[in-house]
């Protein structure tokens, strides 16, 4: 404790890294694993540092305070149409994540065992010492890595572990978090054992009658790779479904046949276990349980993306890794809550933008039926910020890809890999060579999945060879270039690797409701009418139309599922206090914005959608645009019982007529379009598409009372209705346990609503909500410009609501003023 870090650095890029996220042990197993949860932490660099007790996972920066000066960046953002540097405030969250940190723990180990430390992620530039000797250095904060506790260090069963971390200025263009923010494991095995990442499972042939399951098992003796023959051991793997053995494989490599397999899909996330045992003279030396799914995946120009022989399209979102008010510290209940909200919306896929995910996320996607695109990098060797991964790329890309692919190649939910996001190499001479080298390594490690790349420079990559070199081309935005890309790229398939980037603030509505890029307001909010976007982005309807009308599109990944810390576009240039994103379909407090129901109306096929906006608290004489997001074919709007007309969704043919200026009876008119802020970067927002996917009444006179929408089915019969009432003054708090049905292990998400005496939400309420008692963890309200601390038990309501994250069984009271 208080140990000074050695000046001499021993560089050990260990490739054999993590315990599979799907592996497990029991008390009778020769393999034992435990989480190392209790550590001491300091940022004090003096000879006698002051330590604090912390529980891992731990994000040292999330407690704040927020400050404009935290990672203030002077950069050029080309996507914004900039040619000169400008000050970017809040770009990485406005939290104090930069600097150095030191973690220490003392543990006991079994000195007769081979002991391995596994770090699921350490932010960043991790230097790990065991009993004063450096064991491993790993710079990339998102990847999993390991180190051995070498036998010569074990003079007793007591072991001191020290982890030194350093986050550098301009290391990230979003909030990276800080510290040991993912779990740390200790794995004890016999000297002869299956190394972590040592089991590979594939399902090369799959149909409803039978499936081939191929497996290969690595073996290790201490630090050395070895073989079953050399060690005089046998290896046996049983394939189990719900605890029952359905097939067996003998040896280090082999194939088993599973009859009548239960296939994995988002609708049926069936999972198998492979129980591998290493046996010597009748003694089980090691046992590893690897979870996997049986499914087939293919991508062809003829059939598009097929899962288990059925063509489908990704209905996906991109997500950053932070968990809002919890910061980057991983928590399974929080991840489960996010995925449950997305699945209820109809989402079936997640892209891990732009880094390796936490193992818990992949595990949950396997269990809950969420497909995944796993992406390691935001940059290659040409950076976007001064100290980003480009500094490490040349030395570390092989090790980082190797760890990532070996960690997640057995997971049923992983459908494809991405080699990078909007890398500058798209337009540089070295781009084709690098993307080819990366893809070759991916295929060497996993020949079963394709590799995509999120490309935003469409006007170049379509013709310069880069797009042709990407195995499965992904376009970020650039909806107006899809048809050109399909015509000229040889793959004849286009994936929407990143789409929309519509910006909005929950519960905030700007009038008039017009399509506008880079709209800025004095209150630092974006309109909840879902009509605003950045210069380089667009609206959901542009991507809906491409996916609906062209069979050569493979689906989309919307930017983003959840708001995240950092990147507060359009308030990103000297616009403090904005410090978190506006892109999310769901806000930073895990409260859905109106856009949630727009996507649900298109994606959720198991239940109808009917959603009305905005709120109905305006001033007498106001004219208010009213929108309805619905899966029903038509709906009628009423104010205090008076009809304002029945509208239906426009047909594809009618959108062409709308674009030509025609007014069509019974179809929503097109919204007006404001001038582009940066015309040369603006994409055509195609306002004629909106009446196809939403119903819009633009000139509804406000009268206090009720706003009602009535939906009609295909036969013209009333099918559903929704009512919004004018709210009175705040009267009391309404508490909703938002994640109760998810059966959380620890965390309760409590939605706190400020309501009037009749229970109607007060949509403009900004009261300060306080909790007094035990069990508080964090709070948030979804306001990207709010500087209330996440870790204090009080939070202002935003648009009448906020979220308190509590421990199960919390005791106390909520009050407001």
Regions found by a protein language model. Give the residues of each.
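Extended acidic/polar, glycine-enriched regions
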Residues: 154-156, 216-300, 697-699, 703-705, ...
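Short flexible loop/turn segments that cap and initiate beta-strands
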Residues: 228-237, 267-272, 637-650, 658-675, ...
């Amino acid at each position: 404790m208080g140990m000074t870090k050695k000046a001499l650095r021993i560089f050990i890029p260990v490739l054999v890294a993590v315990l599979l996220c799907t592996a497990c042990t029991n008390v009778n197993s020769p393999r034992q694993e435990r989480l190392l949860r209790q550590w001491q932490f300091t940022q004090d660099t003096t000879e006698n540092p002051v330590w604090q007790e912390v529980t891992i996972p731990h994000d040292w920066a999330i407690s704040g305070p927020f400050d404009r000066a935290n990672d203030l960046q002077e950069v050029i953002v080309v996507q914004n149409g900039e040619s000169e540097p400008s000050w970017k405030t809040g770009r990485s969250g406005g939290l104090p994540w930069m600097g150095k940190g030191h973690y220490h723990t003392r543990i006991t180990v079994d000195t007769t065992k081979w002991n391995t430390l596994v770090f699921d992620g350490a932010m960043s530039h991790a230097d790990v010492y065991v009993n004063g000797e450096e064991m491993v250095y790993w710079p990339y904060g998102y990847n999993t890595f390991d180190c051995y506790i070498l036998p010569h260090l074990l003079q007793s069963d007591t072991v001191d572990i020290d982890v030194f971390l350093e986050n550098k200025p301009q290391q990230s263009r979003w909030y990276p978090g800080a510290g040991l923010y993912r779990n740390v494991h200790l794995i004890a095995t016999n000297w002869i054992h299956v190394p972590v990442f040592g089991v590979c499972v594939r399902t090369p042939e799959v149909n409803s009658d039978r499936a081939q399951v191929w497996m290969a098992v690595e073996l290790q003796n201490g630090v050395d790779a070895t073989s079953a023959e050399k060690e005089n051991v046998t290896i046996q793997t049983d394939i189990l479904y719900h605890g029952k053995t359905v097939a067996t494989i003998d040896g280090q490599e082999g194939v088993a046949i599973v009859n009548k397999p239960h296939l994995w899909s988002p609708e049926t996330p069936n999972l198998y276990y492979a129980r591998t045992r290493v046996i010597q003279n009748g003694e089980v030396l090691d046992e590893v349980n690897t979870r996997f799914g049986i499914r087939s995946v293919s991508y062809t120009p003829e059939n598009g993306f097929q899962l288990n022989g059925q063509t489908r399209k990704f209905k996906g979102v991109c997500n950053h890794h932070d968990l809002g008010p919890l910061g980057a510290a991983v928590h399974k209940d929080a991840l489960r809550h996010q995925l449950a909200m997305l699945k209820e919306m109809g989402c079936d896929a997640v892209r891990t933008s732009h880094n390796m995910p936490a193992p818990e996320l992949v595990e949950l996607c396997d269990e809950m039926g969420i497909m995944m695109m796993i992406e390691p990098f935001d940059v290659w060797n040409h950076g976007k910020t001064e100290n980003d991964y480009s500094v490490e790329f040349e030395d570390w890309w092989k090790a980082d890809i190797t760890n990532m692919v070996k960690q997640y190649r057995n997971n049923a939910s992983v459908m494809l890999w991405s080699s990078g996001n909007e890398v500058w190499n798209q337009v540089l001479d070295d781009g084709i060579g690098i993307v080819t080298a990366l893809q070759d390594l991916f295929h060497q490690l996993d020949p079963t999945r394709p590799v995509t790349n999120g490309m935003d420079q469409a006007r170049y990559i379509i013709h310069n060879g880069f797009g042709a070199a990407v195995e499965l081309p992904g376009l970020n935005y650039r909806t107006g270039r899809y048809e050109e890309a399909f015509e000229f790229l040889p793959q004849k398939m286009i994936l929407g690797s990143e789409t929309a980037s519509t910006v909005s603030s929950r519960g905030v509505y700007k009038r008039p409701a017009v399509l506008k890029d880079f709209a800025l307001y004095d209150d630092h909010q974006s309109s909840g009418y879902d009509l605003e976007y950045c210069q380089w982005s667009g609206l959901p309807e542009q991507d809906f139309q491409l996916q609906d009308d062209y069979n050569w599109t493979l689906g989309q990944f919307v930017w983003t599922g959840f708001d995240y810390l950092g990147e507060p576009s359009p308030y990103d240039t000297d616009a403090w206090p904005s410090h978190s994103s506006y892109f999310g379909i769901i806000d930073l407090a895990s409260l859905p914005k109106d856009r949630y129901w727009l996507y649900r109306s298109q994606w959720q096929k198991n239940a109808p959608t009917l959603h009305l906006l905005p709120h109905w608290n305006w001033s007498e004489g106001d004219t208010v645009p009213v929108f309805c997001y619905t899966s029903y074919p038509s709906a009628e709007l009423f104010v205090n019982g008076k009809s304002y007309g029945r509208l239906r969704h426009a047909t594809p043919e009618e959108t062409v007529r709308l674009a030509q200026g025609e007014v069509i009876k019974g179809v929503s008119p097109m919204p007006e379009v404001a001038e582009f802020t940066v015309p040369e970067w603006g994409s055509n927002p195609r306002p004629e598409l909106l009446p196809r996917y939403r119903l819009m009444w633009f000139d509804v006179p406000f009268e206090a009372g009720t706003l009602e929408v009535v939906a009609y089915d295909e036969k013209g019969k009333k099918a559903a209705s929704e009512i919004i009432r004018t709210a009175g003054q705040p009267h009391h708090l309404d508490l909703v346990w938002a994640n109760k049905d998810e059966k959380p292990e620890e965390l309760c998400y409590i939605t706190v609503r400020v309501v009037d005496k009749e229970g109607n939400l007060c949509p403009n309420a900004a009261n300060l909500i306080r909790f007094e008692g035990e069990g508080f963890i964090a709070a948030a309200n979804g306001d990207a410009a709010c500087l209330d601390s996440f870790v204090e038990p009080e939070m202002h309501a935003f648009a009448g609501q906020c979220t308190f994250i509590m421990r199960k069984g919390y005791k106390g009271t909520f009050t407001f003023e």
